[in-house]
């Protein structure tokens, strides 16, 4: 095999064995040797994705000559793809994660074994299939009559009709599939007939070959005496070829042993045989060249005596002569230790017959299988499968979750666990679920870990495995393994007694499951089968009921849909449930003898039961007889309660049929409210409050749960609101109690609590911490209020005293001793406590008066300063406005003078310059002599020259207009007239003389005039054609049929002057008409008058 490089740093190269094989082929073939096939570089070994289940390699093909088609053998099984070729890169969800080795030995298959809905596998042989090259959509209707479309192959659905594909009705699909099935059956019959014919032809060919072999043997017997010398050389060549073939066989056997795991089945030792086919026509010498083939043959045993074997056969070229010798002589047989492995890699392409597409195993999704929403891909029945990829059969059972080992568990469990996987004692003791991590080793022995669910690989041991190892170390069970061989995986029904101790303790919870929950558990779907040719599927539930499901419209029906009525295949599908068939297969495959796993489970369960019995005996030593009797009585009570509950449920079911659902739901909600069912609890915890109420049976189990969920949603908010209001009301009552107590703000909480501990309002606050917080808050508010009241009272006394002093009109020179005598009888004076405070307030009042006087003076000075500043600012603004106004007047005056100078200079030019042929330099000398020249002194030299040029251009334009007016008035001028002809007519006219003295300039102006007139005439003629309604898009066809239509058009146009102007150029006029007609024909019919986009016209 070619060595695979890393990231592309090394080129592709062949090993010596491949080069030697290519050289041998070049020597043995007469024509040019086939080139060695370039080995395609695949991904690195650890990055290579696992092959899909349908591409698993099987037994290698039988030996045959290279590059030649083998004879047909009807007993030969279908050939798999040639070995050595890496599987194709699959989609991302089928690719192996980094550092994950390919599946070998007993490793679990990768998750890619289950095809996703987006990539349906091929159909089984013989099943009617749609045309592979044609995309077909089927039109169907929903129960309410709405039309939708779905792809018959990919199951994709849409409300709108797809474009560019074939669309058929639902009623047309079934006949088409039936016709295809008939065609396939005919093709299979023809293929079988051809196979029989080929087998007969092969038998005849073998008989002929035997006859030829006998004739050759006789000829060889006659010629062997003459070829003894050549026989010695032949023996030497055979010995060399044999040694070389043995070396190649050993190299390839070693490569196979390294690249594939060794199966556990035994096989006879392979052999290396050398056969020498000879062929000699008459008595002449002929050389027969054969190819050396090294192949591993695996024969399928047809009887009990036949066993698979592998052999390495080497054929060498020989030169045969006449001699009495057998046809084929076995030279040597060398036994080799050769394990049964996958077929070796083929370094060159070998044509092989196409392998038949096998039916998909039970794990894969058959055609038209679309999983139900929220349900995983269902495994049929017990979900067992046989992987027949080598000469041995391996039975793989599923885990408790209903999936194969190594596969990701389903998102929503759909199938009840019906099989048990062989587990270690540690798993039986502590683990309640299969671990997601698996341990693997690389080629160099390094350990890594792979997660079957997340497809993640890591070098470090996960925490889950570490905890599992710790649990294994704690558990020490005296269980010895009877054999070192791996235990086969069994399919056993689950037994609660075989579960670990932890699960045994949880059994009472399982016994508490009500009849409604058990019925709901049984009503879950367990299997599904699609109906060919329709979007419907048949679904079986755990209670043996059948309903129909449409994954396209997400519609489920208990009754059979209209398009499935009267179909025999649907009746057959319903009569043969796949899960029951899987149970029967499981019973057939199940081994009757007890295994090591069953013995271990029995020992563990017996030891656990024994421990529990000992514990119960120790606890109930005093009353063993009473306990047993009580247990019997309890069992009887439980049975009687169950019977009574079943009778009540049956009676309630009859009553439910009478009372409307809304009334029953309302009564059920009232019961929940009356019984005080908490909105923050679960259905199981609150069930004991309502289960004995007669209204409990008004609804079935499903409706009870739904109403309870609605009640919880609405009642939760109400309870929160009530709880909040209750807490707020308790706080308000507590505050009122503190206000009524009128305690000293300096009191402590302990004193307050001791005094009011028996008050109901005190007890309404549950936590002492909350009571203390409310008390501290109230005390802080009281203290703050007291402080604010004291401050306010002091401010009022002060303001009243100041008012008293202000009434006596005091000034800064007043004395307290004199003022005191005047105000001491006033109550506002007496309100101040001490005389020192009164004197201090008096001094504050005098200082305030003095400050007020000073502040008034300062305010007056500031007011005067502001007035003066505003006057100065106003004066500056007036001066600025005056200066701007003066400047504007000066600018206007200058502009007026400048305009006056321009007018004077233009008047000067009008009087002095009459000819347009003069220059500025000559005219300037003449203008200087005029007195008006000085009036234009304000103009610059460039401005005067610019005005002169404008004056000259005006004169030239005026003369040109007069000249063209002269040409227009000359009726003899046509579009084809020349200057020589026109010159004779207009040369005496003053306008022609004044235009220019240069005849060349006149001719140039005349030619420009004719050109402009010609362009204008053509434009006017096109406008005339558009205005002529007689010319339409049909005119071209009419003109092609007869020239009369064109003559009619010209006759109509002759009445217009725009047509007559072009009389001098009739050919050009005819071209314009034809071009317009072609344009109308190209545009086609005109759009209707209401069209909003006239540009969208149909073009031919």
Swiss-Prot record:
Keyword terms, alphabetized: Coiled coil, Isopeptide bond, Methylation, Nucleus, Phosphoprotein, Repeat, Repressor, Transcription, Transcription regulation, Ubl conjugation
Residue(s) carrying Phosphoserine: 640, 836, 935
Domain WW positions: 131-164, 431-464, 530-563
Signal peptide residue numbers: none
Cross-link (Glycyl lysine isopeptide (Lys-Gly) (interchain with G-Cter in SUMO2)) at residue(s): 505, 509, 610
Compartments, record wording: Nucleus
CDD domains xref list: WW
Asymmetric dimethylarginine, modified sites: 28, 30, 41, 48
Pfam families with a match to the protein in the record: FF, WW, WW_TCERG1
Chain intervals for the UniProt region annotation (Disordered): 1-90, 258-332, 461-528, 616-642, 872-897, 1078-1100
Biased composition (Basic and acidic residues): 1-15, 461-483, 498-508, 632-642
Coiled coil: 184-254, 607-657, 846-908
GO aspect biological process, one term: DNA-templated transcription
Residue ranges of every copy of the FF domain listed in the record: 661-714, 727-781, 793-848, 898-954, 956-1012, 1014-1079
Residues with the Omega-N-methylarginine modification: 20
Free-text note regarding domains: The FF domains preferentially binds peptides with the consensus sequence [DE](2-5)-[FWY]-[DE](2-5) and mediate interaction with HTATSF1 and probably bind the phosphorylated C-terminus of the largest subunit of RNA polymerase II. The WW domains bind Pro-rich domains.
Subunit: Binds RNA polymerase II, HD and SF1. Binds formin. Interacts (via the second WW domain) with TREX1 (via proline-rich region).
Listed name of the protein: Transcription elongation regulator 1
